[in-house]
């Protein structure tokens, strides 16, 4: 029996593609030197779940690594501020589900996002009361599976399960040696029948 649930964030708890797209395009308007059209929701959807600098390489392939890193850092900083104020679309019934689950399980979030992104989600929607801890790529600079391991060890979890919506989420659970629950309503696909 599980004693805790570790959630992915994007595509599992909320869909933030529209406000992220809005915030990124505000920043990109300040940078005429970046030669690309505005970021689209479809482009952003294809990037969900990737580490931040992999997204930068995908969206800004003509720019140097240094420029990719600098622009992504600026995009993420403004994104955190924007999401903290405006929030995003929570999946139907999320707070009710979290309230029910938190009565039986300890709840956590592990995401490939920048530092401050999970906090923006929690602040905008007043959901911090349901989660014991969080971890992200922005703090660990490691793969999601390793971030899962760090959170599991730090919280002395014995039987956690990871819930996510992409094959990368499934792989991160496998890497951490924990079961995976597939959130089929999310952004991605998981090809294995074992979920």
Features from the language model and the residues they span:
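N-terminal helical cap/lid subdomain that shapes the substrate entry/recognition surface
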Residues: 2-92
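Conserved Lys-Pro-Asp/Glu-containing loop-to-beta segment of HAD-superfamily phosphomonoesterases
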Residues: 4, 144-170
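A short, structured active-site edge motif that brings together acidic residues
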Residues: 44, 127-142
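Short, acidic loop-to-helix structural element flanking the phosphoryl-transfer center
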Residues: 81-109, 115, 119, 145
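Acidic, Mg2+-coordinating phosphoryl-transfer loop and its flanking beta/alpha structural elements
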Residues: 162-195
């Amino acid at each position: 029996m599980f004693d805790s649930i570790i959630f992915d964030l994007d595509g599992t708890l909320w869909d933030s593609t529209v406000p992220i797209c809005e915030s990124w395009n505000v920043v990109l308007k300040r940078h005429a030197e970046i030669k690309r059209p505005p970021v689209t929701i479809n482009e952003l959807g294809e990037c969900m779940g990737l580490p931040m600098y992999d997204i930068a390489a995908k969206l800004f392939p003509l720019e140097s690594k240094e420029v990719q890193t600098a622009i992504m850092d600026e995009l993420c900083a403004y994104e955190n501020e924007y999401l903290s104020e405006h929030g995003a679309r929570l999946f139907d019934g999320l707070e009710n589900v979290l309230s029910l689950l938190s009565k039986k399980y300890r709840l956590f979030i592990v995401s490939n996002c920048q530092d401050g992104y999970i906090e923006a989600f929690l602040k905008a929607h007043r959901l911090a009361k349901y989660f014991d801890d969080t971890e992200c790529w922005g703090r660990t600079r490691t793969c999601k599976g390793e971030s899962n391991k760090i959170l599991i060890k730090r919280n002395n979890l014995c039987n956690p399960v990871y819930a996510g919506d992409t094959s990368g989420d499934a792989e991160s659970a496998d890497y951490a040696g924990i079961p995976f629950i597939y959130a089929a309503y999310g952004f991605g696909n998981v090809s294995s029948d074992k979920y």
